[in-house]
Amino acid sequence: MKKSILGIICSILAIAFTNSCNNATKAKANENDSTAIEDSLYNEIKKGWVYKNSVDEMDGSIIKLATIVSSNAIQFDSPYEDSTKLYICIRNTKEYGNEVMIMASNGQFVSNEFDGTNYVTVRFDNDAPIKFYTSIPANGSFDALFLENPKKFIKLAKNAKTIKIKAPFFIEGSQVFTFKTKKSLVW
C-alpha cells in the first residue's frame, strides 16, 4: 500500500517534470509567458535537487519530496520515441518514514530476485560502486523501483555532487544514468 502511494505521488511529480522538460524544448518557438515558466522549471531541475512539501489530507502531517533528474538521456529502441531520463525521488511521511524510488521516463526496469536482476548499482562521486537491492511498486509497474536501505542512500547522497545509477532495463540491458548537482541533497 505504502509503495503504491509513493509511486503515485512520485509518478505525478515525475510526469510534471518530464512534461515540463519536453514542453520546454518544444515551446522554444513560442515566445510567451508559459514558455518562460517551463524553461525556468526545466533549468531548476537540471541544476539539482528540487524540493516540495505538501500536506497529507488524512492526518495533516507534512509530506516531504526531493527529486532530481539525470543529466544524461539514453535513446532506447522502438517503441520508445523520446530519450529516456531517470529520476530519483525521495519521500518522507509520518506514516512510512523515508523511501527512495527511481523512475524511468521511458522503458521498463528488470527486477527479478530469481535471475539476480533485483538490484541497481550506485556510485556516489568517486567512491566505490554500491549495490542497492530493489523491489517493484505494489501496482506491478516496471517504470519505477524502490531501493532497499533508503537510510544509507540518503546519507551518501547528502555529500555527493555526482550520483551514477546503473539499472537493468528490459531488452536494453543495463544503462548508466548520471545525476549532477552543485548543491548536495538537503534532507
In which residue ranges do the predicted regions lie?
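A periodicity- and composition-biased signal for non-globular, repetitive helical segments
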Residues: 8-9, 32
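Bacterial N-terminal signal peptides
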Residues: 9-16
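C-terminal motif of bacterial Sec signal peptides marking the signal peptidase cleavage site
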Residues: 18-20
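A generic "folded-domain core" signal
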Residues: 22-187
